[in-house]
Amino acid sequence: MDEQRTVAAFVDDHDLDAPPEYRLLDVVSELGEVAKDAAESTDYGAHPDRIAVSDDELGDALFALLALADSLDVDAGEALDESLAKYEARIEASGAPNSGED
């Protein structure tokens, strides 16, 4: 995935290397910012049709996730392809993308 290589180069160029456990904390933190945008824009659920999330926050979360994948030596593109194939198989088998597990 080109985006993963771009993030990896940025991390390397700016000496931002970190172990996976810190990368995971960053992913969760950035997703919290996305959730905050969503919660605030909907007046904490009172107006769900008004949901808005800033591109910047989504970008931060994507950066963090791609940096995590790189720190784990996981090819994000391959992982996404595997996930899409899994969802496709579930839809074909049951008509729904979820696993059916509680």
Model-based region annotation:
Residues 1-58, 62-102:
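Flexible "arm" and connector segments at domain edges
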